Amino acid sequence: MLPCMTPKLSDAAREYDVWRDMQGFAKATRRNDQSALRHLIRSAGDIRVNDCDHNILTQALHKMGETCSASSVNMHHASLSAFFRWCRIQKYIAPDEDPLMGIRYKKVGKRDRRRIPAHQFPGLLDAAKTPRERMIIALGLYLFLRSSEAVSLRLRDVDLQSGTIGVTIYKTGDYDVMPISSELDKELRRWLLHYQEQAGELHPDWFLVPAKKSVGFQEFALNPTARISRPEDIVKETLRRFGWEDTYWQGMHALRASGARAWFDELDANTVDGALRIVQTHLHHSSVTMTERYLGLTVDRAKRDRLLKGEAMFPSLQASNVTPINRTA
């Protein structure tokens, strides 16, 4: 039996966030949950949970579509679906009640991600305004890191002698000791020399690529104990300096996807077995299908093109020197 007075959406949202935190859900997931609930409250008002019906949710998702992309609306849809499942467990709504019942997810059109080809990587790095910005670009291109992963790195995570760098993958909760390529090694050594010149003796707990602080009019210094808050701004500015005009949707994923696709093409061209799975591991994706979409390719098509382009489809026929003679009765 349902209580006579169920909580308002704002109160339920706070209670839900505490529960999700106790269950070990990532901060990013919980932020998405709360964003979806704020959208719902703005649309419907701070009504009681059991007053949410099909029409209210339909209108809320429609309003989200006015300012959000189809994929973002679908993400909010999924977040709200999880919230109302929790509401059923809490008996805030009936066990058989689902205000999202019958509301379809939006179709998301395929969008080609713009990528930087490998031969342009040096030019992009040179376009960085400062050594600090250059190091952020290098982490995206050569380590395929997400923003949260790149800005969280500390000096203690880097071991140039063993050629490894430890990365916390917040999306999965894993800690991966990743290999440092020769390209990344060069950038790290260059950056660490500059870092030491600017900040003095380096401390293991300092951020690998820290925030900056104002020390005068349009003058800045490194702030080793502070984390960069908006790494995407660094990427946007560097891309603009590199010659890209539209950088609105660009961020670390532009670098991550570019580096990953370039490496896959390199491995695939050299017929390395399991090229896609190798790149999948480096991207920390849960499935090959996710990696295929991220790289903008279908491996079977790539193999087909490589095997057939400019080559004979039936080489066995060309190898035969015998010309068949058709006999007539």
Please report, for each region that a protein language model flagged, where it lies by residue.
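C-terminal secondary-structure termini that scaffold catalytic or DNA-interacting sites
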Residues: 1-6, 308-329
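DNA breakage-rejoining catalytic core of tyrosine-based enzymes
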Residues: 50, 93-95, 107-123, 172-183, ...
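Short, basic (Lys/Arg/His-rich) helix/loop patches that form interaction surfaces
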Residues: 178, 201, 232-281
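C-terminal catalytic core of Y-nucleophile DNA break-rejoin enzymes
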Residues: 170-190, 203-237, 249-251
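N-terminal core-binding DNA-recognition domain of tyrosine recombinases/integrases
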Residues: 1, 14-28, 34-112, 245
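Basic, Lys/Arg- and aromatic-enriched nucleic-acid-binding interface segment
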Residues: 109, 118-147, 172-174, 275
